[in-house]
Amino acid sequence: MKKTPQILTALLLGSSFAGGVFAEEHRPNTPSAEYELEKVLIFSRHGLRSPVEKDPQEMAKYSPYEWAKWDVPSGYLTAKGTVLETYFGQYLGQWLADQGLLTAERCASGEGIFAYANGVQRTIATGQAIVAGAFAGCNVQLQHHGKIGSEKDPIFNTQAHNPSQALIESAKNNVDLTALQKKLVPNYALLSEIIDYKNSPNCLQKGECDLGGKVGEYSIKDGKSVKITGAISTGKKIVSALLLAHYVGKPDAEIANGRVDSQEKWRAINEIKNEYYRTLFKNNEALAQNVSYPLLAFIQQQLNSKNKISLLVGHDSNIVALLAALGVEPYELNDSLENIPIGGKLLFEVWKHKPSGKLKFKLDYVYQTTEQLINITPLSLATPPNQTALTLKGCEKDEKGFCDYERFQQVLSESIKNGKK
């Protein structure tokens, strides 16, 4: 397991403790004085990156327009992404200090703080930025497995683990790709118009002129990532490239020639990507458990450890699988174009009810709004990111929004056990 030294940048305008002391009174994540935060595990999606396509001509076939040019290699965290994650880290550090978990003693020793990222550049760089923001001046080092980009970390792999034929058939029967295709007809039509697909090399040279024409298939293979092929996969790739350019602030001429000219259009085309993620494990909790049980087991290990603060940095595919495996109910994220936002964070929170001593659990999705992403808004307790409470169908909430921690541990254990079947 490699350790990456903490990187401090000129972007840090003060420590987490200073921010926590002088911030205005704002407690977006504190249930009441009767509860105290015992520990938290933060699972973060990596921050704002460049598109993952390595061939610069890969996107050219979809549109006659010029695509955005990037100053970092494919799939790398951008400079803006580093700033955004540093700001997010500063907010987290202030919140953790405010809740009494990030103390001066814990900062100095580093004991009880664990930070671990998948071994690719965008996750490691994201982790470094969060650590720099949250734990400025602390004895905290980000860890990862193997050499950067050279080895796959099994914890973060979202591949099927020897799925039975019965599981594969059941999962495929639970997904109606034809109905999904019909549902997205207007979205494909708008995207096709925006990128001028009728004048693309795909249409003019190959005769493939219907962007939404291929229903595709639900692909489940041992040792391979679960995926949906066809038009929704192509649409997701195109929308992702446009959205990343939008977030990073590329000129309009490099974003479909300026044709995505309203928030309504952004929401409409991004629904293709959102539906891909909603559908990937929809009604397929068992498959999600099969895919994600190594990560679920690692999360349980960290929650059961002496660590008070754990940070894991992975990918959107990890979050999609985790939410499905744990039976999280459908949700909506206000002020976000994405349902799995870039840089978004799942907070697995263990709280103690002080009068009774009982442990309670909350799962929150904390994320930067679209406006905060684009404007590079500094975050603090006074200007926090958005937060949405998630609901696990197997863990009933009380009137305060908590479920019993013991019951959550049962849900987690059952998910891991089912995944190993």
Can you annotate each of these PLM segments?
Residues T9-S16:
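Bacterial N-terminal signal peptides
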Residues E24-F114, N118-S310, D316-K421:
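Signature for phosphate-centric chemistry
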Residues S16-A18, T126:
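Short linear Ser/Thr-Pro motifs
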